A protein has these predicted regions:
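N-terminal metal-binding scaffold of metallo-dependent hydrolase/deaminase domains
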Residues: 1-37, 379-380, 384
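Divalent metal-coordination and catalytic microenvironments
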Residues: 28, 56, 82, 125, ...
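Divalent metal-dependent hydrolysis catalytic cores, especially in the metallo-beta-lactamase
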Residues: 58-64, 76-105, 118-131, 160-172, ...
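Charged helix-capping and loop-helix junction motifs
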Residues: 73, 105-108, 150, 228-233
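C-terminal cap of metal-dependent C-N hydrolases
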Residues: 351-386
Length: 386
């Protein structure tokens, strides 16, 4: 890496092809990317890949995004901990809360975001328009759930400074109103996902036509007993929904189920962590908003009261290689599922391409996957001490 003025040159191995590349970066973007011919030193080069993009971060490194007491210092710790784990872009995720609390809390998050323009690129509102059914609600509070509300949409967009980038809803709770809500949200600049839902294939298709792009953490928030042929998993697979996210921690979706779903979905899969405060932290008791979560020594995050899963402790960089381990498919395909594809949902040009923002990871694969450095908009923001 040779910095010069506001420019630098990096030599690294392309994560897809393994070929040695010379990459020139100026003013935070890739200026020139070219193959290095006949390089005898390329095996010593680090691998280079676009930074990871996580659409669902509830917390990280001991910090809860949903905490009323979230400070600017804590928010910066969370952002930098995510840098350390390969994440150059993420959505701070707000779970279901009282309707009248969204405006004030999003104003606060927007202020934090403006003061610390790091890797948080906006907000994901997971709720309050979710299914109250026992199998689908997860740890979200039923009493705070409601039908889609267009006036609420205007309020949260204004309060967030337009930074609500993803909203997860269950369209079956009011089909007609949900379709109207999806159209309006998309028009205002937010992507829409379906999740915590029992939507049928027909309703999913209607939502797709209206603009829905994603199913949020498929396989999670699902009743343990479903009809043999008419169930959410088959309906999502058979639908035209462009993407479905999966949590590759082996706890939310066991290995065999993960293999089956990813084979069926193919390139429609994206990876998310659904990380909560206990991620990149010690076992113990944490909070996800109002919910008390116990993280056990194996890293499983469980709601203390109900015993249900309450987010994950997955680190994004590890998620790529856990997905590879569970499926046996090439790791670089999972890297795309955790970087380029989620960026597409948000309309962000991402990837190793001239003119794109130079936000990337440098890492080794042997003897184990290991993140060396992370760059954000051409600036080194993390360097391993090892």
């Amino acid at each position: 890496m040779r910095p010069q003025n506001n420019a630098m040159k990096i030599e690294a191995r392309d994560y897809r092809s393994g070929l040695p590349l010379s990459i020139s970066i100026e003013k935070g973007v890739y200026k020139k990317i070219e193959r290095i011919p006949n390089s005898h030193d390329s095996l010593s080069f680090p691998w280079i890949a676009p930074g990871l993009v996580d659409l669902q971060i509830n917390g990280f490194g001991g910090i809860d995004v949903n905490s009323e007491g979230l400070s600017s210092e804590q928010f910066e710790i969370l952002c930098r901990k995510l840098f350390e784990n390969g994440c150059t872009h993420f959505l701070a995720t707000i779970i279901t809360r009282p309707r009248n609390s969204y405006q004030k809390y999003l104003q606060k998050l927007n202020q934090l975001h403006c003061a610390l323009p790091l890797n948080c690129i906006g907000f994901h509102l997971e709720g309050p328009f979710l299914s109250p059914s026992e199998g689908s609600r997860g740890v979200h509070r039923i009493e705070w759930m409601m039908k889609p509300d267009l006036s609420w949409l205007d309020e949260v967009m204004e309060a967030s400074g337009g930074k609500v980038k993803l909203i997860t809803i269950a369209p079956e709770i009011d089909r007609e109103l949900s379709i109207q809500f999806i159209r309006e949200a998309v028009a205002l600049g937010s992507a829409v996902a379906i999740g915590h839902s029992e939507a049928s294939w027909e309703i999913i298709q209607s939502a797709v036509i209206a603009g829905a792009k994603l199913w949020t953490h498929l396989g999670n928030a699902l009743s343990p007993v479903v009809p043999k042929f008419q169930n959410v998993l088959l309906d999502v697979i058979a639908s035209d929904l462009p993407y479905a996210s999966l949590i590759p921690d082996g706890k939310h979706v066991p290995m065999v189920a993960f293999r089956a779903l990813t084979k069926a979905l193919g390139s429609r899969v994206i990876l998310v962590s659904d990380a909560m405060a206990g991620a990149a932290a010690s076992p113990g008791i944490y909070h996800l908003g109002h919910i008390e979560i116990v993280v056990d020594p194996q890293g499983k995050a469980i709601e203390k009261q109900s015993g249900r899963l309450g987010g994950s402790t997955l680190r994004p960089f590890d998620g790529v290689f856990l997905a590879h381990k569970m499926t046996g498919t090439p790791w670089w395909e999972w890297w795309d599922a955790y970087s380029v594809r989620p960026a597409e949902i948000l309309g962000i040009p991402h990837g190793l391409k001239e003119g794109n923002e130079a936000s990337f990871c440098l890492f080794d694969l042997s003897p184990r996957p290991f993140l060396r450095e992370l760059y954000h908009k051409g600036k080194k923001v993390y360097c391993s001490s090892q």
